[in-house]
Amino acid sequence: IMISTEYYRYFVEKHVCDEPFIRMAKAMGVQDAQRAEDFVTALVQLQEACGVAELKMSDYGIAREGADTLAANARETMGGLFTADPCELNHEDCRMIYEKSYR
């Protein structure tokens, strides 16, 4: 949850799967969705409605400096899941997502 907004924003900004994001935004209630970015907006609204939008890594003892370690750990332990992403996420991409997500 804490990295989901930046995770999906990464793919939205790459424009690697705009149509699926538009369809998901519509499924989430954005009737007039026309841009992939509408999915990220709907995701943030859903997080707010569920009371999880304010989750912070810092509240769980995660330090900003740990982004590199978290990225390496994600790739080492969950590497197979990375093949399901719409485009390749390398170590630097993962680290950046963690850093942008940090609060």
Question: What is each model feature region?
Answer:
Residues T5-Y8, A25:
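Conserved protein kinase catalytic domain
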Residues I1-I3:
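Conserved phosphate/anionic-ligand binding catalytic regions in large, soluble enzymes, centered on
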